Structure formats: C-alpha cells, structure tokens
C-alpha cells in the first residue's frame, strides 16, 4: 500500500487499535510492543510523539527528578525510562496536573507513578509498569533528555509515535511509521471484511480462510 504523505501519521495511529498495530509490527519484524506497561484506567487512550527521559540512580550531590514538563509540546507523550523500578516513582500529582493543563497527550513509564487518583479524575492518560506511594526524590535523577530509551521490550526514540489503549502501548519507530501504519490499516480493513462476511452468512472458518486471517501478522520474507 502507498504511504499517506498528506495525512498526519499521529492521526492515522489514533484511528487504529494497538492490536492491529502489534500485528503490523510482527509482520515487519519490529519489536514495538511495550510489554508490561498498562493504563491506570482501561478507558485511557493516547497517540502522539515521544518526549523521552532517561533516569538513573541518584548521585551525590543529588540531581532532580526533572522539570522537563515545561518543554513538552501540546499533544506530546512523556516517555520515562526508570528501568522498571517499582521502589522510586517518577511521576505524581503535580506533573499530572501541569501536563493536563498544558494539553500534553499522556505519559508512559517503564517504572512507577503515584497519585493515581488525579490522573483518573482528570482523565489524563498515564501508562506505567506499577504504582506506589514512594517518591523518587533522592533515589533517582534525570540522566538524559531526548535520547533513545527502553519501555518494556521496546526501544523508543524522541519523535517516535506512541499509541495506547486498554491493551497497552505500542511504539512506532519514526523510520518505519509509514510501513507500520500501512500494514496496520490493511489488517484492520481485512478484519472488517471478515466480520461483514460472517454477517452475510459465511462461516467464520471460511471467511478467515478467504482473507488469509491466520497469516496477517506473519513476517514477510
């Protein structure tokens, strides 16, 4: 399928479920599934480009957990790599409130957040590996902004597209976004055709066979 140079790819991603995007990534041999990263609320949705932050252990003298939120553009997705740590949170109520006020698109954390009630109250999308009450101050600090980070089993660079829904989060690498979105749109279309075929009286087995359902995600050679 051809690319869509006149269509914003974030909007294209927002129209797709993470399941179709995951199958497209499998087909292309790209590891973009952020396994283990879940929404605080299954109704949360996000789609936007990544603003990446890497955390490390607190040094002496201690650095800070970061004031980067002032630099995140509206619609951007804050992506925090804290190495999956559950013992030191890197996102809380002040950041949630400021991000919501500034129309940031959401937050994705390989690690823990806290003050989860406010994210739910404001319907501000937060996806994380865990949550806790324990602060990250004096335990972790920002090491780098704008680099490539790890989120679950995926690598995420600044400007990559993230798409989140009730099933989790997908990273769409910037270098491959047209190919991934084209494949996901094709998969989504075929699944709709299967549903219509069943509505018309065809058996699910025959509808799936007709449209190659069982190999939609198979890597192309």
Language model features with spans:
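C-terminal binding/interaction regions
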Residues: 162
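Beta-strand-loop-alpha-helix segment that lines the small-molecule cofactor/substrate pocket
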Residues: 165
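Channel- or pocket-lining gating/hinge segments that regulate access to a cavity or pore
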Residues: 168-170
